[in-house]
From Swiss-Prot:
Protein family: Belongs to the LarC family.
NCBIfam families according to UniProt: nickel pincer cofactor biosynthesis protein LarC (TIGR00299)
Phylogenetic placement of the source organism: Archaea, Methanobacteriati, Methanobacteriota, Stenosarchaea group, Methanomicrobia
Protein name: Putative nickel insertion protein
Keyword Membrane: no
Cited InterPro entries: Ni_insertion
Length: 396
């Protein structure tokens, strides 16, 4: 089990992501073959040194005469390339992300009529297909991205002078919920292609997840900056047989809120995607009775859950403790059949294992067992025991 972490302290572009993944150990021959069979280009790889850091520089050599393609033309090219299914699915989604962002910015709802400019050229096609193939080649269980340095200032493009980040890039960041920051470099450091590739593959994190670095790679950018213009990537193995997970903890104190409101809030938060909810009694200043509401959430769900807490309780604010790394067992739901009093019933059981497949725990789904208990007349505790016993025989 391993994770890939991109650390874009100098931004990211398609060729930088491709070079980084190749430097981490992706199959160079396979990636080169896929790129050159999918687009009218050739690919060269060389080692360079950027301000003291050795990196891979990927050069996509394109025909002298290039023309802008429409989004449907790009889709047809990708589908005609006979790529591996995972690579094709990733490439199509990356181009869809760019198309939807361009459409939103330009007010063009019909993607069939959408013309790509820079991102519709052969080098962008090669970057997307190559990066998708290279990242899949690394066989990572998860991919993360720390806050992206987008640069600052303005850029010149087909639509004239635009601010950094470019509107389409900013829209991709918004939709992908990636963390980003401005930098003191008066230059575009994050391209739309780079943003779309990261939005497809990566979950946002503030810091590196806990673990051991097993490989480090650098992909070189074209421009010469004051610092090293490279994209850093790190392959990390968790220091455990459990599965790494990134969560945020939301917490607030609430007084003058009835039990009925708290009970409803509990259910609402879970239905909105909270991983877990705890409501604990507390005593506040001047001896006022109150409750502490604590929620475990995915980072991308925190804002909507915090708003729900404020709206439902009247709280003036919610504390967010970000990017906490927890280790969890790998869990999946299986359905099994059990025999009770001569009748056969079906129930779900939750199976927990570590990353090496060792069984850690089996628990029967309570709601299923409750229904079986009502039908069979067998106490629910006995139904759960029998279900877990049967599951242990099947899955141990």
């Amino acid at each position: 089990m391993k994770s890939l972490v991109f650390n874009p302290f100098s931004g990211a572009a398609g060729d930088m992501i491709l070079g980084c993944a190749l430097d981490l150990g992706a199959d160079r021959g396979e990636v080169k073959e896929l790129i050159e069979s999918s687009a009218p280009v050739s690919m060269d790889i060389r080692e360079v040194v950027k301000k003291g850091i050795k990196a891979l520089d990927v050069r996509i050599n394109v025909p002298e005469k290039e023309y802008f393609r429409t989004y449907p033309e790009i889709v047809d090219l990708v589908k005609a390339s006979k790529l591996p299914s995972k690579v094709e699915a990733s490439a199509l989604d990356i181009f869809l992300k760019m198309a939807e962002a361009e459409a939103a910015v330009h007010g063009q709802p019909d993607l069939e009529k959408l013309h790509f400019h820079e991102v519709g050229q052969s080098d962008a096609l090669a970057d997307v297909i190559g990066s998708s193939a290279a990242i899949h080649s690394l066989n990572c269980d998860s991919v993360y991205c720390t806050p992206i340095n987008v640069g600052s200032g303005t850029i010149e493009c087909a639509h004239g002078t635009l601010p950094v980040p470019a509107p389409a890039t900013l829209e991709i960041l918004r939709r992908g919920k990636l963390y980003f920051r401005g930098g003191n470099v008066n230059k575009e450091l994050l391209t739309p292609t780079g943003a779309a590739i990261l939005a497809h593959f990566a979950k946002p994190v503030d810091n590196f997840p806990q673990g051991r670095a097993v490989a480090i790679g650098y992909g070189a950018g074209d421009a010469e900056l004051q610092g090293p213009n490279v994209l850093q990537g790190v392959l990390i193995e968790p220091d455990s047989h459990l599965v790494p997970d990134i969560i945020e903890v939301l917490e607030t104190n609430a007084d003058d809120v009835s039990g009925e409101v708290l009970g409803n809030l509990f259910e609402e938060l879970l239905s909105m995607g909270a991983r877990d909810v705890a409501i604990m009694p507390a005593t506040m200043k001047k001896g006022r009775p109150a409750h502490i509401i604590k929620v475990i959430a995915k980072p991308e769900d925190s804002a909507k859950l915090a708003r729900k807490i404020i709206v439902e309780t009247g709280s003036l604010g919610v504390r967010v403790m970000p990017a906490r790394h927890r280790l969890t067992a790998s869990r999946n739901i299986e359905r099994i059949k059990i025999d009770l009093e001569g009748q056969e019933f079906e129930t779900a059981v939750k199976i927990a294992r570590d990353s090496e497949g060792v069984l850690l725990n089996i628990s029967a789904e309570f709601e299923d067992c409750k229904k079986i208990a009502k039908t069979s007349g067998v106490p629910v505790r006995e139904v759960m025991r029998r279900a877990e016993e049967a599951a242990r025989k099947l899955f141990s």
